[in-house]
């Protein structure tokens, strides 16, 4: 624990440096001269993966994806927006309103741990969350409003802190849409979707708004009755010297869940593949946010300020073991999360020419965040009626991160990037059991470094190394007794867990219209205790090592056809064998994706087809139980004019009986032994599904 992080620093006090620095930056930029007249905003065109990034990228595995690439893909669920990142797999084990399951680089990231997601500077990952640490629910995003996705992998970027060991993604939304539009979609299983969005310019400003409603019952025997409402309003002002945007977003979702089911019951014919054991599982969630972004531009320097306030609420009912713990009322449990989080970031970047040639760019920045969690509850329930409280907490969690990075071009063939960040955390837990209340402080320093050789023939070679971390649930940092019985002593978790990574890679655009990257990487995570949100206690995890190779290719074959193909191979193991084995459950060793998109321009045919494969995976440490591989093909075909567009989507076009996800653990059905049955539990992928849409652009 560092003495540099004041013991009396409250979460609210963490906001003061940001606000003061922002005021100084604004005064410095505006003192002595008025801002120039506003300029007219124009729609921004992003090339996406066709942009080779040679000469600008810091690692081989980072990249960008543009709006036109997102628009060409058929999506089953909102989290699949992240599948545009090579190697990322998105699945679901419950209802559509719950955050998806994320997989990358041999990690089962659960609902977001070790993968950082931001939207226009606002964090999506929720720390000390009621269901799981780093919970990242993307249901509040409207896909048509995303103009670009920036992504990177590994702990190599100083501006990214918590939850970024495996990687990070930043969604950037349109300031002004290329066209106003209305989209209506209908599909099987009572799927219906309406999106209305548009932009308007006037008085030197641009205003953009969007609304979405989605209903889906899914193929489940229990109608999912998933209703999603999304809204967005953005006001943007731009001049030669500064850009400002103010954004408000809102989301609400309600659903009924078909959670994972036991394979034994399906094979015995007593449970349908799309059936359920507990028909009362489900939930509701809401999110509302306001954010501000400002950029002040000088001849050789840029200052950026971001601030946000977010309200969030989740009420979730789940039952994964059925009647194992309670043979009468069942094992359903209720997780509740109600919070407000505020924060922001300030950075200043300046560039200079080096004596003798070359250039250097330095960025210093600070990031602050405070989560005020008024309710963090875990309760036993039956048919959504609360029976008992396992634990109920209030949590204040604050953090301050400071970073610096420098990129220098030493000569025509050598670039370097070096940086470091310091993060300090304060945890305060007020529990219904005073023995589990308390305060903790912790901090961590994470250095990063990288070299880039080239370009030669539009080819660069990268070498990167860095340290990263993720925070753990605040409740685990102060726990002393197991809330399940109120007696058993429990060890407290490490507040901040260390990760270490290296990567070697090549990026080339030597062949016309073809961008290819290959990266070799390794990532170590320390052993730690982690808080288990489903149980309210802690459990140990051993040290892990993951390494692998990634290949990504994007080819603009003609003016109307693009092809892409990506392959990821990963080796993931525990570094010590404690007797159970060294395999990491749900670590996917092989991920392959490929796609073809065609578009004849503003008018004519358009469409695409995508294949996603992920290989078999261990479900327990000794590798004696494995989940099968999964292959999914989605397709889209349509016709457009300058004002109208019609399209047909086919999801799971081969109608394969895939598992979306599988686990191995003990559960109990009525009539089974009290000790339960060890079994594979799975959530099936949705079968072949048709959806049609019509879009009017104006």
At which residue positions do the language-model features occur?
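Transmembrane beta-barrel wall of Gram-negative outer-membrane proteins
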Residues: 186-215, 220-258, 281-302, 350, ...
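Short acidic/polar hinge/loop motifs at secondary-structure boundaries
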Residues: 123-153, 171-172, 266, 493, ...
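Face-selective signature of the C-terminal outer-membrane beta-barrel domain
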Residues: 243-251, 283-432, 454, 514-520, ...
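Extracytoplasmic beta-strand/coil segments of soluble accessory domains associated
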Residues: 62, 79, 83-126
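Membrane-embedded beta-barrel scaffold of Gram-negative outer-membrane proteins
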Residues: 293, 298, 302-320, 454-470, ...
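Short strand-turn segments of transmembrane beta-barrel domains in outer membranes
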Residues: 150-158, 167-200, 211, 216-220, ...
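Gram-negative outer-membrane beta-barrel transporters
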Residues: 347-353, 416, 517-525, 539-621, ...
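C-terminal beta-signal and adjacent terminal beta-strands/loops
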Residues: 613-620, 639-698
């Amino acid at each position: 624990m560092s003495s540099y992080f004041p013991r009396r620093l409250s979460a609210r006090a963490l906001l003061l440096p940001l606000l003061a620095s922002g005021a100084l930056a604004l005064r410095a930029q505006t003192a002595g001269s008025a801002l120039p007249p506003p300029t007219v905003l124009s729609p921004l065109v992003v090339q996406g993966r066709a942009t080779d990034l040679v000469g600008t990228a810091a690692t081989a595995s980072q990249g960008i994806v543009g709006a036109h690439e997102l628009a060409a893909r058929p999506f089953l669920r909102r989290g699949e927006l992240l599948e545009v990142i090579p190697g990322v797999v998105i699945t679901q084990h419950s209802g559509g309103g719950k955050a998806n399951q994320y997989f990358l680089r041999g990690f089962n990231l659960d609902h977001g741990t070790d993968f950082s997601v931001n939207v226009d500077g606002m964090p999506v990952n929720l720390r000390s969350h009621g269901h799981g640490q780093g919970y990242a629910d993307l249901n509040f995003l409207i896909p048509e409003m995303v103009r670009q996705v920036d992504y990177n992998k590994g702990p190599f970027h100083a501006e990214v802190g918590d939850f970024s060991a495996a990687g990070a993604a930043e969604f950037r939304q349109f300031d002004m849409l290329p066209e106003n539009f209305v989209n209506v979609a209908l599909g099987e299983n009572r799927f219906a979707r309406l999106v209305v969005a548009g932009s308007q310019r006037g008085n030197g400003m641009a205003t953009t708004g969007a609304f979405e409603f989605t209903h889906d019952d899914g193929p489940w025997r229990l109608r999912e009755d998933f209703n999603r409402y999304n809204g967005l309003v953005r006001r943007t002002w731009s001049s030669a010297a500064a850009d400002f945007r103010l954004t408000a977003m809102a989301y609400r979702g309600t659903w009924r869940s078909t959670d994972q089911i036991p394979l034994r019951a399906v094979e015995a014919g007593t449970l349908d593949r799309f059936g359920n054991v507990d028909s009362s599982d489900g939930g509701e969630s809401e999110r509302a946010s306001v954010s501000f972004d400002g950029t002040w531009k000088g001849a050789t320097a840029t200052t950026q300020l971001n601030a946000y306030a977010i309200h969030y609420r989740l009420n979730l009912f789940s039952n994964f073991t059925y009647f194992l713990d309670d043979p009468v009322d069942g094992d359903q449990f209720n997780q509740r999360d109600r919070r407000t989080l505020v924060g922001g970031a300030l950075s200043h970047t300046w560039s200079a020419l080096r004596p003798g040639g070359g250039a250097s760019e330095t960025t210093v920045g600070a990031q602050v965040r405070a989560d005020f969690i008024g309710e963090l509850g875990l309760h036993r329930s039956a048919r959504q009626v609360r029976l008992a409280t396992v634990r109920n907490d209030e949590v204040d969690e604050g953090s301050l991160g400071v970073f610096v990075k420098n990129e220098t071009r030493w000569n025509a063939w050598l670039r370097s990037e070096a940086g470091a960040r310091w993060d300090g955390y304060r945890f305060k837990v007020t529990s219904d059991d005073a023995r589990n209340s308390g305060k903790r402080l912790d901090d961590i320093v994470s250095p990063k470094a990288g070299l880039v050789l080239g370009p030669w023939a539009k080819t660069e070679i990268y070498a990167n190394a860095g340290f990263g971390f993720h925070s753990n649930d605040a409740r685990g940092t102060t726990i002393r007794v197991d809330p399940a019985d109120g007696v058993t002593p429990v060890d407290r978790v490490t507040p901040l867990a260390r990760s270490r990574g290296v990567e070697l890679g090549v990026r080339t655009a030597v062949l016309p219209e073809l961008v290819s990257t290959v990266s070799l990487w390794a990532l170590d995570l320390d052993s730690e205790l982690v808080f288990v949100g489903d149980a309210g206690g802690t459990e140990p995890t051993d040290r892990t090592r993951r390494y692998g190779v990634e290949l990504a290719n994007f080819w603009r074959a003609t003016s109307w056809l693009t092809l892409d193909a990506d392959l990821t191979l990963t080796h993931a193991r525990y570094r010590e064998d404690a007797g159970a084995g060294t395999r990491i459950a749900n670590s996917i060793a092989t991920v392959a994706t490929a796609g073809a998109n065609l578009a004849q321009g503003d008018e004519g045919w358009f469409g695409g087809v995508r294949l996603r494969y992920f290989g078999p995976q261990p479900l327990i440490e000794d590798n004696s139980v494995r989940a099968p591989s999964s292959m999914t093909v989605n397709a889209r075909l349509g016709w457009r004019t300058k004002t109208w567009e019609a399209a047909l989507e086919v999801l799971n076009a081969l109608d394969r009986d895939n598992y979306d996800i599988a686990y191995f653990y003990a559960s109990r059905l009525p009539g089974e032994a009290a000790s339960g049955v060890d079994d594979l539990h799975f959530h099936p992928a949705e079968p072949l599904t048709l959806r049609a849409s019509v879009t009017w652009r104006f």
